[in-house]
Amino acid sequence: VPAPDTWPDAHAALSALKVAEDRYSYIEPAATYDAFFYEGRSLGFGITYQVEADALALRLVQPLSPAHAAGLRRGDRIVAIEGRPLADILAADALAEAFGPTEAGAALEFDVRNDDGLRRVRIARDWYDLSYVIGPGVHDVGGRRVGYVNFYSFGRLGLTPWQTALDRLLAQGAQDLVVDLRENGGGLVAIAAQVGSAL
């Protein structure tokens, strides 16, 4: 393995060290990492998506994000970016390039399809406050009261909204609890341990 100082930058070093199957290693500036995990803020559009053959299916839209303010919701599909069809972007392996610069104010036009049809919306990246707990509620399932909560991140500020949601679900008569961690990217082990100990 070449010495670290033989690469022009950290991104080049990571690219050289990664194997093709590695989808998880990445480099992030310390400022955005600290903002996300310690300050409860993020910079971006505020979407989590699944890549399909010709679209990005939105799995989660942060409630206080630019994307949510522009009307995007879970289940919507982005079918074009800046007028370029997603199928073409994906075929060229150019998704990261299509999303462009990551700084605040960088804007893109998205063609978004949902049950209401197709529309074009322009969204600028910006800082927004994270919602750690999304969509808590109690549902009647098989004669039991089942609480549901989507817990987004084990960030430092996530414990209070988690406890508030848990108290609310119990007050509404929840007998069972579903904790949705599908979009949870991890975080601080101490927070995860405290969340787990509450169950």
Question: Where are the regions a protein language model picked out?
Answer:
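Flexible, low-complexity junctional segments that flank or bridge functional domains
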Residues: 1-177, 183-185, 190-198
